[in-house]
A protein has these predicted regions:
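Single conserved hydrophobic/aromatic residue that forms the stacking wall/gate
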Residues: 1-5
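Acidic, turn-prone loop/beta-hairpin segments
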Residues: 6-33, 61-152, 166, 171-176
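Short helix-adjacent coil turns
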Residues: 36-43
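Aromatic-lined ligand-binding clefts that engage carbohydrates, nucleic acids, or primary amines
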Residues: 45, 49
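Glycine-rich, charged/polar anion/phosphate-binding loops
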Residues: 152-158
Length: 178
C-alpha cells in the first residue's frame, strides 16, 4: 500500500496526527537504513522497536480510535485506515531482515493494492525520499506537545493512584509566542 498517488491521502486531507506519524516514519526509515548500512543490527532493531511501540502503537493508534468510530466522517476514516495500514506495512518491511517469518505472516494478512509485492522478501525497501512531501515539522512539534501533556497527566495519575476511569480537570497554559 502506497501513499504516493493515492486520492485518499492527499496532503490536504491529513490531520496533524497523520502528518506526525509520517514525519516520524520518515526519520525512522532514514535512521534504520543507516544502521543497516553500518551493520549495526542492534541499533536498527531498537529504533524499529521504539518507533513501532512508542510512536505507532502507543500514540498514533490511540489518536486514530476516534477517527475509526461508527460516527466518524467516512472520508476521514478511509484516510486514517490507509495510513494505519501503510505505516504498519513500512514497519514490517523495516523489521523483515530481523524477523522474516513473523513479518511475512502478518504481511500476508494485510490488505494490499493489486500491484503490491506478494511477499515482503520481494518488496522494495522503504524509501524516506518518497515520504519527503509528507514531512511536517509543525505537526511534529504540535503532537510532541500533546504527547508531553498526556504523559504528564498519566504520570500524575500513576503517582497519586488515580484510576484512568476517573475524570480529571486539566488546564493547560501555553505561552503566547506571537
Amino acid at each position: 500500500l502506497s501513499l504516493v498517488g493515492s486520492e485518499m491521502c492527499i496532503r490536504d486531507r491529513l490531520c496533524a496526527a497523520d502528518q506526525w506519524i509520517l514525519t516520524r516514519l520518515n526519520d525512522t526509515i532514514r535512521e534504520v537504513s543507516a544502521h543497516f548500512e553500518d551493520y549495526d543490527l542492534g541499533l536498527a532493531a531498537q529504533k524499529i522497536y521504539d518507533f513501532a511501540w512508542s510512536e505507532f502503537c502507543d500514540w498514533y493508534i490511540e489518536f486514530s480510535k476516534a477517527r475509526l468510530g461508527a460516527d466518524a466522517d467516512p472520508a476521514d476514516r478511509a484516510v486514517c485506515q490507509r495510513n494505519l495500514v501503510f505505516v504498519l506495512g513500512q514497519i514490517l518491511r523495516l523489521l523483515h531482515p530481523i524477523m522474516p517469518f513473523v513479518t511475512e505472516q502478518v504481511y500476508g494478512e494485510m490488505p494490499k493494492e493489486d500491484d503490491a509485492a506478494p511477499m515482503l522478501i520481494v518488496a522494495a525497501w522503504p524509501d524516506a525520499g518518497e515520504l519527503a512531501a509528507y514531512v511536517d515539522e509543525d505537526a511534529e512539534r504540535a503532537i510532541a506537545m500533546v504527547c508531553e501533556v498526556v504523559g504528564a497527566v498519566r504520570s500524575t495519575r500513576a503517582r497519586y493512584g488515580i484510576s484512568p476511569k476517573t475524570a480529571l480537570p486539566v488546564a493547560v497554559k501555553v505561552a503566547d509566542t506571537a
